[in-house]
Amino acid sequence: MLSRLFRMHGLFVASHPWEVIVGTVTLTICMMSMNMFTGNNKICGWNYECPKFEEDVLSSDIIILTITRCIAILYIYFQFQNLRQLGSKYILGIAGLFTIFSSFVFSTVVIHFLDKELTGLNEALPFFLLLIDLSRASALAKFALSSNSQDEVRENIARGMAILGPTFTLDALVECLVIGVGTMSGVRQLEIMCCFGCMSVLANYFVFMTFFPACVSLVLELSRESREGRPIWQLSHFARVLEEEENKPNPVTQRVKMIMSLGLVLVHAHSRWIADPSPQNSTAEQAKVSLGLDEDVSKRIEPSVSLWQFYLSKMISMDIEQVITLSLAFLLAVKYIFFEQAETESTLSLKNPITSPVVTSKKAQDNCCRREPLLVRRNQKLSSVEEDPGANQERKVEVIKPLVVEAETTSRATFVLGASVASPPSALGTQEPGIELPIEPRPNEECLQILENAEKGAKFLSDAEIIQLVNAKHIPAYKLETLMETHERGVSIRRQLLSTKLAEPSSLQYLPYRDYNYSLVMGACCENVIGYMPIPVGVAGPLCLDGKEYQVPMATTEGCLVASTNRGCRAISLGGGASSRVLADGMTRGPVVRLPRACDSAEVKTWLETPEGFAVIKEAFDSTSRFARLQKLHVTMAGRNLYIRFQSRTGDAMGMNMISKGTEKALLKLQEFFPDMQILAVSGNYCTDKKPAAINWIEGRGKTVVCEAVIPAKVVREVLKTTTEAMVDVNINKNLVGSAMAGSIGGYNAHAANIVTAIYIACGQDAAQNVGSSNCITLMEASGPTNEDLYISCTMPSIEIGTVGGGTNLLPQQACLQMLGVQGACKDNPGENARQLARIVCGTVMAGELSLMAALAAGHLVRSHMVHNRSKINLQDLQGTCTKKAA
């Protein structure tokens, strides 16, 4: 219950940082204003002469007080150093400075508001600083800085408050009760300092629970700049910080604190309310006199300066001990800000929070040279799941993004370089806390019993025992994900199995697999998974198409492709944009059936081409889906074989599975009318899918799209760096005549497949369908009053594309679809998102055609690729497998 309340409080504070900060500052100013203008009008030293108590001030007391102040400042300095180890010393340092300053101001205002004097603040200041515990800020900041986005910052702050809030509250209560005992001592100085201490603890608690989380959330929100796909403030060594913070406080310690609190409450109650009140009254009278509240002792004087000048003079008047203290504070602040950057710049600086991948690779290789061989370490890993944590940390490979190990399973897919194959399972966080596994693998019979036990399962088995069961054929290797408690552990074990069978056991070292949502992959996208392949994603645009602008994501490893397409998009935009139309929409499936004789096949063909036969088949076909609607049948014969090409709309799905289901149902219905018909295959390559085919070029498949644009002569000259005449000439002789001479089918273009494939990979399409989807004819001609403008059109008859199903279910691919505004199914007009995506593909292809044809016409192609598309890595430094074998 308490954790839930603190979580709600943390979420509110992190979600409304401006409101909380402004509210805190406003409350502080209001309390100060009420004291200054509407509070007690008796101000000691300005308009009222307070009693002076003669006290002997020894030089030793001044020295002790100065030493105490210096110790307090050093304590704060070391607290900031520990806080800096979280990552950015600037972000957290500023937040910590805000916390200390606001705590001090709030304590001062509380003291003013309660009408207490400030004469004891000089002595109480060191104790105030010593009571500040920045480990609280450190713990909460760990939660915030382990986030991938601003929304996750809020969630993690709320989660941190739920875990740390009850502990903070209990600690503050115990501190107040313990320090409050000093207020009953009867010693004036001790009572004043203890009173300050209690107020400081309460002020710190208030600020840490409100001002600090709001400040951290606001600072991270304002630091929106990203680097390598992650927030600039996100640091790599926060990979397992949430797992560390999940450890609950020691329950024994918590019980002791609660018992202590109860005892102290009884002590306070007995001393203040139950004991004989007469001593209390005398003490109160003494306190009243000591604080200058007895009007018989005090007397009013005429102020010589204004009130603000009085306060200013008190602030700037300093003794020698105060000068020493401030000098030490200034020197430590300068050292902290300016002279401690070098030691943390490589890993903790905001400018470069993560080491370069190339440097990391070299460091990993160097470290490997100093350790035992990889195979030996792997064997050690298979025989033990509990190894030295230091050794585990030594074998880590630098990640691209921080890995957040969360207690709750989320559907977030983030890209993290996987640990090397030598990383033990304990480093993966796969074993639950409290489960102790044996060092040596147990017998197969015992392991099978544990695996089949509903209360235990695979989490009570080590990786070595799982591998042992796989090798003994008790567990199929392809079922590892379904049998393990997490999909990721199944992938990890499969990698371990595979690495022992490879010629180079460390081959999988840089193939990432960690922190990926495999639940979206299993049974939908891939089998026998050993990881995922990060591919760079660039953006071309804005593409001005049909009056709208699109930023087009392109996943590719070919240099110059995105840059070239981007130039084409710019030329189209400067020319007023492009226009597009979807001419046809229908996915196809072409099964093959066989009849006893060719004449029987001809009879079936004739029946299918009649309205009655088509209506029967359409009814059976349409009954299989609420989206699939049979449009037409294209039937042809080859001897006694009959090829039937079904064409149907499939909504926003690419539709191969949908139309296959309808085709199968229609064939069964057809078999009822012609019992001698034999169904050979639901796909007879008459579709045609993933193969060059004239039928797709002629009849179309998927979406048939045409796109056009007019590029002004000025844009052709200044952006494309060529002339309209040259581009038209090259297009005719290259794209038309050249492709015809090569016998191309649908390849009357410069490089449509480049753009299609890049968009397909980014948007979760079937990359193999670029074969048919890249069918395109690019036409160019001179236009305009002077025939100097360039008219260009691209016609693509077979774009096989969809926005639901398959790879579009993966979150990174969904992100790219969301960039284009076509993610998921269109509720208002089913199929519109897929058609719009096909238009974008065609428009982007036209942009790519423009730029490449201009480069060819101007003779810039080879030059640009020699400059921008050549790797700068020195291959002589990289020894391949063949080199090692030869050596």
Swiss-Prot record:
The modification Phosphoserine is found at residue 871. Its main location: endoplasmic reticulum. Pathway: Metabolic intermediate biosynthesis; (R)-mevalonate biosynthesis; (R)-mevalonate from acetyl-CoA: step 3/3. SUPFAM superfamilies: Multidrug efflux transporter AcrB transmembrane domain, NAD-binding domain of HMG-CoA reductase, Substrate-binding domain of HMG-CoA reductase. Undergoes sterol-mediated ubiquitination and ER-associated degradation (ERAD). Accumulation of sterols in the endoplasmic reticulum (ER) membrane, triggers binding of the reductase to the ER membrane protein INSIG1 or INSIG2. The INSIG1 binding leads to the recruitment of the ubiquitin ligase, AMFR/gp78, RNF139 or RNF145, initiating ubiquitination of the reductase. The ubiquitinated reductase is then extracted from the ER membrane and delivered to cytosolic 26S proteosomes by a mechanism probably mediated by the ATPase Valosin-containing protein VCP/p97. InterPro entries: HMG_CoA_Rdtase (IPR002202), HMG_CoA_Rdtase_cat_sf (IPR023074), HMG_CoA_Rdtase_CS (IPR023076), HMG_CoA_Rdtase_eu_arc (IPR004554), HMG_CoA_Rdtase_metazoan (IPR004816), HMG_CoA_Rdtase_N (IPR023282), HMG_CoA_Rdtase_NAD(P)-bd_sf (IPR009023), HMG_CoA_Rdtase_sub-bd_dom_sf (IPR009029). Its EC number is 1.1.1.34. GO terms for biological process: cholesterol biosynthetic process; coenzyme A metabolic process; isoprenoid biosynthetic process; long-term synaptic potentiation; negative regulation of amyloid-beta clearance; negative regulation of protein catabolic process; negative regulation of protein secretion; regulation of ERK1 and ERK2 cascade. It is an enzyme of class 1 (oxidoreductase). This is 3-hydroxy-3-methylglutaryl-coenzyme A reductase. It comes from Mus musculus (Mouse). The lineage of its organism: Eukaryota, Metazoa, Chordata, Craniata, Vertebrata.
